[in-house]
Amino acid sequence: MEEKLQILHDILKRSGYSTTKARRLIFQLLHDQEPQSMHAIYLRTNGEVDRASLYRIIRIFEQAGIVQRVYVGWKYKIELTDIFSHHHHHISCLGCHKLIAIQEDEQIEKLIQELATKHQVIATSHQLEVQGYCSDCQRTKQQPLLSGN
């Protein structure tokens, strides 16, 4: 964790910001966690960071490349970028809004690189979003009827 806090400090310093107690706390709350909503992060601060400060910190973290948004339908959750964790994608359940992490997959990465090459693009980053219904929601019929069902 100390190594990652040093990386956080270096990134913030390069971006013109200092490593405050509140910024360190938000980083620690996101470390080794599933993507979290802003509300969930706010609750986990136990009043140590007010809501306005949380939104400012997340905006700074996004601009500096420390965190990224993971979209779940039209809403989003926040997670640390690949600088701090292994590269992965998500499947989001439209029924219960659970996020399922897909660990790095060589086939997906190869396809993305092939598409970038085909379209003469140098890909610097990407996010793959898959939406559907998890096995629990399929079992409990929490998905809309699809044609053919």
Feature names for model-found ranges:
Residues 36-45:
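Short acidic, hydrophobic short linear motifs in intrinsically disordered regions
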Residues 64-149:
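Non-DNA-binding regulatory cores of transcription-related proteins
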Residues 54-65:
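Basic amphipathic alpha-helical segments that dock to polyanions
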Residues 21, 33-37:
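Short capping segments at the starts of secondary-structure elements
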Residues 28-32, 46:
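Short, locally clustered residues in the helix-turn-helix/winged-helix DNA-binding domain
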Residues 2-27:
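Short alpha-helical segments that sit at the start of domains
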